[in-house]
Amino acid sequence: MKEIRAYVQPHKLSQITMALMEIPGFPGMSIVDCEGFGRERTEHVQDYKPFLARKRLEIFAPDELVEVIFETIMRTARSGHHGDGKVYIIEAHEGGRISSGERDKDLG
């Protein structure tokens, strides 16, 4: 199991969500509002604030779905401009379902 964590432009969220929901067996996701900056920084003359609004997607998926989810996000979130975002794949060693108490090393 892996976590796919993506930082995307807020205006792309609905398009990304619709594309991900078309993937058979898509496990769902969490969305978090966040701010940040990367190599390309904006400079505001007044009230300097380098942080830009982003949406963070957190998806825990079985290994067999990771590549299709990753590629779907990369394709759908891309506008071709700086600041489109980043996608990471992170190893998730173990998880648990609170409602059932189920604990598994490959919990989907």
Which residues does each predicted region cover?
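Positively charged, small/polar-rich N-terminal and surface patches that mediate targeting and assembly
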Residues: 1-108
